[in-house]
Amino acid sequence: MNKNKPFIVVIVGPTASGKTELSIELAKRINGEIISGDSMQVYKHMNIGTAKVTPEEMDGIPHHLIDILNPDDTFSAYEFKRLAEDLITDITNRGKVPIIAGGTGLYIQSLIYNYELEDETVTPAQLSIVKQKLSALEHLDNQQLHDYLAQFDAVSAENIHPNNRQRVLRAIEYYLKTKKLLSNRKKVQQFTENYDTLLLGIEMSRKTLYSRINKRVDIMLDHGLFREVQQLVEQGYESCQSMQAIGYKELIPVINGQMIYEDAVNDLKQHSRQYAKRQMTWFKNKMSVHWLDKENMSLQMMLDEITTQIK
């Protein structure tokens, strides 16, 4: 361990891999507190679809960066990094171990390494104006929206396919918020870590993972996911960026009478599997992770291996 830097444990892995359970049991062993590294669990009222840890599951372990925003608020890697750094300092100063658990690769990477991320924070009044301008573009088809982006950021338009509507909208939103071009944004990674980091990941065969994902979706639906999405739509959150998350965007067309339920469930499972694949690709290509084989290791075996590395 590097005594000159704060020590943190980071647990990554794809959706449905068991990060929550491992992080809680590890926190019990090493006197830790958990910081969520998930971009969606920050939102209130979005519990089932984000697989948010419940108070019962927490079992007395403090959790941070959960339920801190409303669904119409925005959240970025910049905000996550700023808040997580403050939490790490506070937790460390109280003699406890910060454990960051989550599957949002950019958030984890920005925290561990010296990323320079620009502040996209705007006032509520400015955000309202940005939302109005984005709403005015909703009627445009993908090509028209792409052409609009090209008018002020040709480089981003060149690098983003017209059918990738979400990325096109992201580039437009960035410009409306900052008056800067997304293509010029600086994101510099130094090859030194901010912390003395034990970076762990949970892995398993694709067949096992996909089976766990399909089962989890069924459980979410049994626990009321459809009603959760329905309530968010009724509260006026349908057009919010947070509602583009997997688990929410697939069910909105059912609520609006545009798709049958069974097709939406199939889409939800497929999108979840595709997301898990992207997560694993990110972690394996961009980060140096010590992998724990969930298929061949029990929870206790994983905990024993982790605590051995910490000592």
UniProtKB/Swiss-Prot annotation:
Q: Which residues bind substrate?
A: T15, A16, S17, G18, K19, T20
Q: Which named protein is this?
A: tRNA dimethylallyltransferase
Tell me the HAMAP family matching this sequence.
IPP_trans
Superkingdom assignment: Bacteria
Gene name, Swiss-Prot/TrEMBL: miaA
Free-text function comment from the UniProt entry: Catalyzes the transfer of a dimethylallyl group onto the adenine at position 37 in tRNAs that read codons beginning with uridine, leading to the formation of N6-(dimethylallyl)adenosine (i(6)A).
**Which reaction is catalysed here?**
adenosine(37) in tRNA + dimethylallyl diphosphate = N(6)-dimethylallyladenosine(37) in tRNA + diphosphate
Keyword Nucleotide-binding listed? The answer is yes
Q: Which cofactor does it need?
A: Mg(2+)
- GO terms assigned for molecular function: ATP binding; tRNA dimethylallyltransferase activity
User: Where do the annotations place ATP binding?
Assistant: G13, P14, T15, A16, S17, G18, K19, T20
Pfam families per the UniProt record, alphabetical: IPPT
Matching entries from Gene3D superfamilies are given as: 1.10.20.140, P-loop containing nucleotide triphosphate hydrolases
| Species name | Staphylococcus aureus (strain NCTC 8325 / PS 47)
Gene Ontology terms: biological process: tRNA modification
Keyword terms: ATP-binding, Magnesium, Nucleotide-binding, Transferase, tRNA processing
Is ATP-binding one of the keywords? Answer: yes
At what residues does the UniProt record annotate the site feature described as Interaction with substrate tRNA? Answer: T104
